[in-house]
Amino acid sequence: MSHPRWFGAALLAALAAVASLAIVAASGAAGPPLPKSSNGNPVEVVGTGVPTPTAFAFTGSTVFAGSGPNEETNGPGGLFTVADRKATKVPNTPPIVFGLAWQSDKLYVSTGPSIVALEGWDGTAFSKETVIFASTNKKFAGFNGIAFGPEGRLYAGLSLNPKYDHSQNPYKPSQAVVSMTAAGKGMRVVAEGMRQPFQLNFPKGSKYPYVTVLGQDKGGKAPNDEIVVAKPGQNYGFPTCTWILPKQEKACKGFDEPAIFLPPHSSPMGIGSIGNTLYVSLFSGTGKGPEVVEMSTKGQPRPLLTGFAAPVIALGVNQGSIYVGDLTGSIYKVAAK
């Protein structure tokens, strides 16, 4: 991958292990088999051909899908619209996308080292691109997912520099969730002590983002993956505390406990919500392969979609349906209820 420090060492390692499986799964003439829903609702293919899907955004009937670097060709991904079982590249847009958020008739895009705002959408292309935040400091690990809070500030998870996979990154800000104005001003740290906060979502009525956090993959006993509710001033302990209890009970004293623990290596990626129900894509799953789970804001995940041909990354919610993208490049949709 061309930008490993922006996308995360944990995901890189997993992608390398499963890339060949994704190729095989996608190579059939009929495409990969459809995942199965636990609620009995049909799963449909919205589009195909989105390499390494990372995020979704929606406006009207338009579905935007962001894409990271192409894992098979090492070429760029970018921004696509998906409809009628195909993906269409949006011209003159960033070649790599890690997060998307639609707000006030603008599409905000996390490209890694920068966040840009696209406006003037005519159904095919945007007429204007504005860089609202960009870092030229090579020590800045970059941005992952983004989401707008109810007060209008833009929140972002910061990417992992793999050099600090088990240690504190001395560069500030890092290993944190940050927020800024819609114009990219006044960036400040919201919460810290997270190895790699990936995607964010504000459930109905929540002032704070629910954030998927990827735990360590190597070096001793693997800690649980996490979902945190990033409240101002909180510190979730990384790297001093990775919540391996009771072993780390003393080390974790004084830190803020994550809201939800998930099994090690389950790798929570995308996150969305309908009311107080969370929907989370698990890259590796809880033991039976990649899956999408649903749970209350207090946890207790249960399967919603299983049987994917390849690991899942992107997840979004729109008009009562769950959208998910896997490494075959396929985008699926299923009604939540």
PLM-predicted stretches and their roles:
Residues 31-37, 143, 160-188, 194-302, ...:
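Beta-propeller domain segments
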Residues 11-23:
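Bacterial N-terminal signal peptides
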Residues 64-84:
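Beta-propeller domains
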Residues 42-48, 86-92, 130-136, 186-190, ...:
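A short beta-strand motif characteristic of beta-propeller blades
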Residues 113-148:
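Asp-box/WD-like beta-propeller blade repeats and closely related beta-sheet repeat scaffolds
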Residues 1-13:
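Bacterial N-terminal signal peptides that target proteins for export
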Residues 68-70, 112-114, 120, 159-161, ...:
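Short loop/turn segments immediately following the C-termini of beta-strands
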Residues 49-62, 93-106, 110, 137-154, ...:
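Beta-rich, blade/repeat-based domains predominating
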